[in-house]
Amino acid sequence: MLGAVVGGIASALASGAASKLFGGSQRGVSVMQQGAESAGLTNGGGAISMDNDQGIQSAIQGSNVPPAGQLPESQNSGVMADAGNMLRNAGKSLLDGTIQAGSDKVKQALIDKLIGGNDAKDRGKATRDYLAAAFPELNPWERAGAGASTAGLESSAQNQQKEMLKMQLDNQKDIAKMQMDNNLQIAGIQSATSRQNTKDSVYAQNEMLQYNQRESQARVASILANTDLTTKQATHEIMRMALTRAQETGQHLTNSQIMALEKKVYAEIGKIHQDTQNSRYGSSQVTAAAKDVTNMITDAASGASDWVSQQWNSFFKDGKSNGISLNTRK
């Protein structure tokens, strides 16, 4: 009998689990009843009986006697009631666990269906279909990303090369501009220095010539004032003084220039002597004559300096100064 009870319980539980998964709760109860009847645990009315023993049941029924021809309702109490409750609880727990496991599996299947399960092939196909619809202008190779990384790297490298080349060109341009500015500044400094040096040199030379001219004029006046000297002697003294002064200043006269100057001085001295004798104020006449003679000597001796002054005034005058005056006829 114990084997029949255990077999009936197992059959009922299995049938109940199957009914919960595939047919609902009503079908599960029907299957459990069929299992109990096959195990001999029912009396045909759906109640569990113990070999049709109605002794205890009759005592419990009391005055509630069933109608004729109908079996009394079976009720369990005591140990049998506890055994029935235990069987029902065990079956319910097993059935609930089976249903929970089945529902978890269904839930996971639903999630996999909605957002993609663990099938990499299916997910890859879905991704390719999506990319093909979203980017129809790309070919499969580009949508797969096979050439994207290389293209990005090449584009980045080209941009970097362009930026580096631009920086190099900008640096070269800046360096060239700096060099040009420096060269212009150096050239300007050199030009200004050269002009200033030339101007200073010419001015210094001019001042020296003017000093020499004044000194020569004083000496000529002294010679002319000496009445003890003849015209020839006076001419000789004046020429000797003029040639000495020319050598001191680095000016050299040719023989023809010396001869021409000597003739002019001789004629001028003769004229001075005649005018002095006829003049009331001899000293003033001597001074004027000395200046004329000195100018003649200066014209011949300082020709080179006058040429430099003329060149300066013609080519180097900046428009802000008066230039350098000539040495003649001071």
Curated annotation (Swiss-Prot):
Gene Ontology, cellular component aspect: viral capsid
Region (Disordered): 57-79
Localization per Swiss-Prot or TrEMBL: Virion
Keyword set includes DNA repair: no
Disulfide feature: none
Any Pfam family: Microvir_H
Gene3D superfamilies membership: 6.10.250.2700
Keywords, sorted A to Z: Capsid protein, Viral genome ejection through host cell envelope, Viral penetration into host cytoplasm, Virion, Virus entry into host cell
Example GO BP: symbiont entry into host cell
Keyword Cell cycle set for record: no
Subunit annotation: The virion is composed of 60 copies each of the F, G, and J proteins, and 12 copies of the H protein. There are 12 spikes which are each composed of 5 G and one H proteins.
Function: Minor spike component of the viral shell. Involved in the ejection of the phage DNA in the host and is injected with the DNA in the periplasmic space of the host. Involved in the determination of the phage host-range.
Protein name: Minor spike protein
Organism (species): Escherichia phage alpha3
Lineage: Viruses, Monodnaviria, Sangervirae, Phixviricota, Malgrandaviricetes
Gene behind the chain: H
